[in-house]
A protein has these predicted regions:
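Hydrophobic/aromatic ligand-binding patch that stacks against planar heteroaromatic rings
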Residues: 184-185, 233-234, 425
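ALDH superfamily catalytic-core signature
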Residues: 48, 192, 199, 209-220, ...
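PLP-dependent aminotransferase-like
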Residues: 165, 177-229
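N-terminal Rossmann-like NAD(P)+-binding subdomain of aldehyde/semialdehyde dehydrogenases
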Residues: 1-150, 184-185, 197-202, 211-216, ...
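An acidic- and aromatic-residue-enriched active-site/binding cleft used to recognize and process polar
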Residues: 171-172, 198-201, 226-229, 245-249, ...
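Active-site-adjacent "gating/activation" loops or surface patches in catalytic cores
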Residues: 133-176, 180
Length: 561
């Protein structure tokens, strides 16, 4: 970039930050009611711009509005954002009226002595009906209990943030991510935000400036577009007090420790980061799906195979929550049957446009040494069975961020012994700490509750799911979302800190989501769902005006899936 362009970028940035500095002072003076009114004003804008939002994302990803995949852009875009805004508004109302967030149930102590805080269902949003059969809890750190649940809460005094400006470097894959990250910084952390959109989804600029006009008008938010030069200017600007980054750990390390290997090594050795301001992040993950050996019915096997396949193909697999490593037992009699079901499902799902930059190169890297026939510009869904961490280390230690999933086997027919070995394996051999799933037979869940809870406790992940895809945890918005709290600047793994967390919990380690082996009605994220787009739009209408009168149409479409 030439000097003139650099100067122009700096002038624009300085002008933008000047507006935010005034907004930061105004935010400090805003009452709870005033902030809630801003939240509600943004929520009121979403229905007017939702169609535009979905159309531009589908167009960019080459998805027809009539395809099942179009539902992903509704659910992971305006519908999810509207749910989050409703939950945020409810949080501020609860704090204003009751002094604390109102949990959906009472905390409990589980069999291994961990305090578990319920965060689902939210009855005001009809969760018991919409997320039927699912439960979610936040597990506190072992040394904490229910007597110290909440972080510093929003208040009329508004001591949070203290006039600070946050730089948010947005995700390029899922449209709700930059929006919810930005909202978290403003309404949880009390910091105004300079949001830089990722070049991959800069097409959201017009939609976002319209939806979030109430925040922009109050100078609590400014949105910029641009490439690396704009990102670097934001990171290094002295008036930016904190950063939130969504991307790969390579991006994080380049920001914190430097752009080349020697510089990074020297700075790490001397504990001398390039950036001396707080940094939170959500990074990548080689997401594991552990299958506990046991006897499953054909229906259960098929349902779990669909869950796995859905987790691979969602958003063309450009997700940090996409399953990248299935862990099975070499002694499990149903292993071949299960994997064949996953393979068949993947073969029957049309390949998707690989819209994310570098996908072809990452696909070839993941399939190194294998002959893969590619007959179209789209990349084929690929399941690589019986992989080994020594001969194919890249599949275990690098998030491919492309439509490739691997499978590896561990010995053992005893379910408890296998699960213990699998937990140790994914903790030690796989990159990342974001999320993991365990599929377990009903008999195991019923008879080995203690073993299952110990396994969940030992997994070093920010979210652990039983029989369900971790993408659901992201979409719920009530759970804290982020990597395991053991991460730090030198080893960020899947990220530092968290977002969402609409009950303002603290001292937590992970979210635990549980569901049945067979979900009814069919999950809307299954590719085989026949009416997914109708469900998505009906859900958005429900979150627009939560009312029992909007449920019949939602259920009509859901039951036809």
């Amino acid at each position: 970039m030439n000097a003139a362009a650099t100067s122009e970028t700096q002038v624009e940035l300085d002008s933008t930050i000047l507006k935010l500095k005034q907004g930061a002072q105004d935010l400090k003076a805003m009452s709870l009611k005033q902030r809630r009114q801003l939240i509600d004003a943004c929520a009121a804008n979403i229905p007017d711009f939702a169609q535009q939002w979905v159309e531009v994302t589908c167009n960019a990803k080459q998805v027809s509005l009539t395809q099942p995949a179009a539902a992903e852009e509704i659910l992971a875009g305006p519908a999810t954002l509207l749910r989050y805004l409703r939950l945020l508004s409810r949080l501020f109302q609860d704090v204003e009226q009751a002094g604390t967030p109102q949990l959906p149930g009472s905390p409990r102590c589980n069999q291994i002595g961990r305090t578990c805080v319920p965060i689902l269902p939210v009855r005001s949003l009809f969760d018991p009906l919409i997320f039927r059969g699912l439960s979610a809890e936040v597990w506190l750190n072992p040394e904490h209990d229910e007597h110290d649940l909440f972080a510093e809460l929003p208040s009329d005094q508004n001591t949070l943030g203290n006039g600070k400006i946050a730089g948010v470097l947005g995700a390029g894959n899922v449209s709700a991510i930059p929006a919810t990250d930005m909202l978290y910084k403003i309404f949880h952390d009390g910091e105004v935000v300079l949001l830089k959109l990722n070049p991959v989804n800069e097409y959201l600029y017009s939609t976002f400036t319209s939806v979030f006009a109430p925040l922009i008008e109050k100078q609590l938010l400014q949105i910029l577009r641009g490439g690396n030069e704009v990102g670097k200017a934001i990171v290094n600007h002295p008036e930016i007090n904190s950063l939130h980054v969504t991307g790969s750990h390579h991006t994080h390390d380049a920001i914190v420790w430097g752009g080349n290997a020697d510089e990074r090594a020297n700075r790490m050795a001397n504990n001398d980061p390039l950036v001396n301001k707080p940094i939170t992040s959500e990074l990548g993950n080689v997401t594991p799906w552990i299958v506990v050996p046991g006897k499953y019915t054909n229906r259960q096997l098929q349902s779990q195979a669909e869950h796995v396949a859905a987790s691979i193909v969602n958003n063309a697999s450009f997700n940090c929550v996409a399953t990248k490593m299935i862990v099975t037992s070499s002694d499990w009699p149903q292993r071949s049957d299960f994997l064949a079901r996953v393979e068949t499902l993947l073969k029957n799902i049309p390949p998707r446009h690989a819209y994310y930059p570098g996908a072809r190169e990452r696909f070839e890297r993941a399939n190194a040494g294998r002959e893969i026939a590619i007959s179209s510009p789209a990349l084929p869904w690929t399941l690589i069975q019986n992989t080994d961490p020594k001969s194919t280390a890249h599949l275990f230690q690098e998030e491919s961020f492309v439509c490739v999933c691997a499978e590896t086997m561990l010995p053992g027919s005893d379910p408890v012994e296998f699960l213990n070995a699998a937990v140790e394996f994914v903790n030690d051999k796989l990159f990342g700490t974001l999320c993991a799933t365990i599929t377990a037979p009903n008999s195991f869940e019923n008879q080995e509750t203690l073993a299952l809870e110990k396994a969940i406790s030992k997994l070093r992940y920010g979210s652990v799911c039983v029989n369900q895809w971790a993408g659901v945890v992201y979409g719920l918005m009530t759970p804290p979302w982020g990597g395991h709290p053991s991460s730090d600047l030198k080893s960020p793994q899947s990220g530092i800190g968290h977002v969402h967390n609409t009950f303002c919990l603290k001292n937590f380690e992970k979210t635990v989501l549980r569901g049945p082996l067979c979900s009814q009605p069919k999950p809307v994220w299954f590719h085989s769902h026949k009416t997914a787009t109708q469900v998505g739009w009906s859900l958005l209408k429900l979150y627009d005006k939560p009312s029992i009168t909007r449920l019949p149409r939602l259920f009509f479409h859901a039951l036809r899936g």
